[in-house]
Each structure stands twice: as C-alpha cells, then as structure tokens.
C-alpha cells in the first residue's frame, strides 16, 4: 500500500523536506500532487530518521505546503528496455520525444546499474574503425575501451561526435553494432543538429538517442548518462550487440552535479565541485567494458569541454585517471582549418597496442604509427626553431621535417567531417607522407615492411 503524506515542512529551490515518513529509501521516486491535481515527480536524496529530503524534477513553483500531498513509489528511476528502443529518440528521463509510439518494455532496469566485476571483465583486444585517421591510425579505439575526447569551448566536438556515431564499425565480424548517443545539457540548436544528422544519414536506425536540453532540470541532467548506459547494457549483454556509447558533454553533467550538491549545502571540493566527483564519474565510466561469457561489449567515448582549455581542471583531470587515454582537440589546428582538429601528440590511447597488427588492422600498423609520431614531433620542433631563428638556420633535413609536419596536418589529420576512411586508406596516406623523408630517417620501420608497402616512385 502506498502512503500519502501531507507533512511538507519546507521547500527551498529544487529541494523539499517532508516529516513523518516511514520506510522511505535513498534514491526512491516520489510524486507530489498539488492542490489543483497536477503531479510533479521527485526523488529521495537523503533520509534522516522520519525526515526525507527530496529533489524535484520540475519547478517548485505553486507547491502549497499545507494542501500538497507526497507519495513514494517504492522504486528508483528505471528505463523500460526492448529491442524496439533502436531507432528512437528519448528525453533525458527516458520518455520518447520523436513522435513515435510508446515503447512496450520487455523489462524495466534500474538506471544506476552496477559496474562490471573486475574478475568478470575480459581484456579489450579488438579494433573499432571510426573512419577518422587521427584516431584509427595513431590513437586506436579498442572494443571495450573508455576513450574520452577533451575539447574546448567553440571547437567542433559535436561534428566529430556525430561523425564517429555515423561511421564507427567493427570489422571482420557478423556481430551486430549499435550506437547509444546521450546529449547532456545541450541547446535546442545542437539537439536539432544531432537528430537531423542521425536521420539524414540513416545512422538513427542502429542508434538510441537521449537528449537533455540546457533548460531541463539539473537532476534530469544527472540521470541522462545513466539512462544511456542502461540502454547500452541491455543491448550489449542481453542482445549480444557491440555498443558504442557517446556522451556529450560531461562538463554539463558535472556542473549539474555541483548545482545539486550546492542545493544540499554539502561541503565543496576543488572549484566548488562535490568531493565525490571522482567516485561519481567512475560509477559511469566503469560500466563500459567486455564481460567473459558475453558476446557483446560497451565502448565509451565521453566528450567534455575543458573550461578555459585547462587540462588540470577537475573534470578532465579526474576523467583522465579513470579512462584509458584521451583524444585532445587543438584550438591552434582549428584556426588553421584542420578538420577535425585532433592534436595527435598529447593524445593517447593506452590500449591501442592491443587492437592493431596482423589479423586486426595490418602488420605494418605499429611501425608506421611510431614513425609518424616521431617524424611529426621532430617536424613541430623544426617549425618552432624556424619561427625563432628563421628558415636559413635549419639544416636540409630539418626543412624536410618541417614540410612533413605541414603535409601531415593537411593530408592525414584533416579529412573533414564527411570523409569515412578505412584503416587501409589511413595506412596508405601514412606511407605516402613517410616517402617525403629519406630512408635513413625511417629507423622505426622494419625493412620487410618498407619494401612491401612504401609507394614506388
């Protein structure tokens, strides 16, 4: 039996205090019935004796303390799953917003899920092709990996996100592939861009999209990534699909967490974020991976904008501790019209060595990757020297490297947001660029690969 309480003590912003409650649990959902019959939803943040602190999903305007009633539903926030969720667009709270019919769920799953038991994890080892050379060739994404994209305000991370969602595929397997895309705290314009691009390119057919707008409540923003991960877990571990989860923007998520924490008057941590920000992010990121005995997998690409392009800001800093690398977008490359502006030198995929090589990409992948990194790094150094001392101060070989760095950015990194390159095309472009340098400089490439793959003049 569901009890109703008319003992609302206080309302402060999005928070409400209720006295005299019994059997109420943390994270439990509730309904507030206003005097005019309107229903608003809430969830329990804290229980102390017979007093419950709840947070409203909607505005607290119009709540009359004496006449409003509260009832608790005995369950936490959940999402109804079935194979029909593919091809659909949902709100941040899991309601269809694409004009289609309601989903008839096979079951309802708690959105908080559970991180994968470390003993049950399988090591990521299979290549995922994104069609983006700077990722596939140099910072390879591996199935089951967590690889964030660190962007800055005004950089085209939204375009890169939809490009990866549209192009990503698992090669050489009959396994089904799906994308779960969660847009957190975005504008109407961005929401329209994401949804129209998914529909125009047909990517929507293999995708589940969750959209939380900037004017939606902060508590909904905190729930949206977990809705997406619940859908991903169902598709991966019950439907045996390989799922790529893209969440943009984690910064908006953390801001919402800070807002909720401030409303609860919690002691703030670094820069006002709650002290449990690291733990909270880990409960999301660690839901990605592969499990022994399961065909499916969850690969995650969280995207975040670094405030003031600061890599030491708590959000990118803590994200870097939990995830397996990072892809960094560069404002300098963006100004040169390099699209996507991925700065490959500070970028890193810690699991890339496990997903490349013979039988996965190609036997020469590791050698060309190492040589391209080394040559581009030296080319950047040569260009810095040229800017200080002038071109005449450089040796002939340094001039070659400086030219290589320019061509590398134009030909390899820059490909636009509509070009889908196979790994073979990416490797061929790499070999073509390396042919600009004399063989004596290519010390990281084995002779047999040089003879086999170097383009003949």
From Swiss-Prot:
The keyword Transport applies. Keywords: ATP synthesis, Hydrogen ion transport, Ion transport, Transport. InterPro entries: ATP-synt_VA_C, ATPase_a/bsu_AS, ATPase_F1/V1/A1_a/bsu_N, ATPase_F1/V1/A1_a/bsu_nucl-bd, P-loop_NTPase, V-ATPase_su_B/beta. It comes from the Bacteria. GO terms for biological process: proton motive force-driven plasma membrane ATP synthesis. Pfam families: ATP-synt_ab, ATP-synt_ab_N, ATP-synt_VA_C. GO terms for molecular function: ATP binding; proton-transporting ATP synthase activity, rotational mechanism. Belongs to the ATPase alpha/beta chains family. NCBIfam families: PRK04196.1. Produces ATP from ADP in the presence of a proton gradient across the membrane. The V-type beta chain is a regulatory subunit. This is V-type ATP synthase beta chain. It comes from Clostridioides difficile (strain 630).
């Amino acid at each position: 039996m569901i009890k109703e309480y008319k003992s609302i003590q206080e309302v402060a912003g999005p928070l409400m205090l209720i006295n005299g409650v019994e059997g109420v649990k943390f994270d439990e959902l509730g309904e507030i019935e206003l005097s005019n019959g309107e229903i608003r939803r809430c969830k329990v943040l804290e229980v102390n004796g017979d007093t419950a602190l709840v947070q409203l999903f909607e505005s607290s305007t119009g709540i009359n303390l004496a006449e409003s009633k509260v009832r608790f539903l005995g369950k936490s926030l959940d999402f109804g799953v079935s194979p029909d969720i593919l091809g659909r667009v949902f709100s941040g709270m899991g309601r269809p917003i694409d004009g289609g019919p309601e989903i008839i769920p096979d079951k309802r799953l708690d959105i908080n899920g559970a991180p994968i038991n470390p003993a049950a994890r399988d090591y990521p080892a299979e290549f995922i092709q994104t069609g983006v050379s700077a990722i596939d060739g140099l910072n390879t994404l591996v199935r089951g990996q967590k690889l964030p994209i660190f962007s800055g305000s005004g950089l085209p991370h939204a375009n890169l996100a939809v490009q990866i969602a549209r192009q990503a595929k698992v090669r050489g397997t009959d396994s089904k592939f799906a994308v779960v895309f969660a847009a957190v705290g975005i504008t109407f314009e961005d929401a329209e861009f994401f949804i129209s691009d998914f529909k125009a390119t047909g990517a929507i057919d293999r995708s589940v999209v969750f959209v939380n707008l900037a004017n939606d409540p902060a508590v909904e923003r905190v729930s949206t990534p977990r809705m997406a991960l619940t859908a991903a877990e169902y598709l991966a571990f019950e439907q045996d699909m390989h799922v790529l989860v893209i969440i943009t923007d984690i910064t908006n998520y953390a801001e919402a967490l800070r807002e909720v924490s401030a409303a609860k008057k919690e002691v703030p941590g670094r820069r006002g974020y709650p002290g449990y920000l690291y733990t909270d992010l880990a409960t999301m990121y660690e839901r990605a991976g592969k499990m022994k005995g399961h065909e499916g997998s969850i690969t995650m690409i969280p995207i975040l904008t670094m405030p003031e392009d600061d890599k030491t800001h708590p959000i990118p800093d803590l994200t870097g501790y939990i995830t397996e690398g990072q892809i960094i977008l560069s404002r300098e490359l963006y100004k040169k019209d390099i699209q996507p502006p991925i700065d490959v030198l500070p970028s890193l995929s810690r699991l890339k060595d496990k997903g490349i090589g013979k039988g996965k990409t190609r036997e020469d992948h590791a050698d060309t990757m190492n040589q391209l990194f080394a040559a581009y790094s030296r080319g950047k150094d040569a260009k810095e020297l040229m800017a200080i001392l002038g071109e005449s101060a450089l040796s002939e070989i340094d001039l070659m490297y400086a030219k290589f760095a320019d061509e590398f950015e134009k030909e390899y990194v820059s490909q636009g947001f509509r070009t889908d390159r196979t790994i073979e095309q990416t490797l061929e472009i790499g070999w073509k660029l390396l042919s600009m340098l004399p063989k004596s400089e290519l010390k990281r490439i084995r002779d047999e690969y040089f003879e086999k793959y170097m383009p003949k003049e």
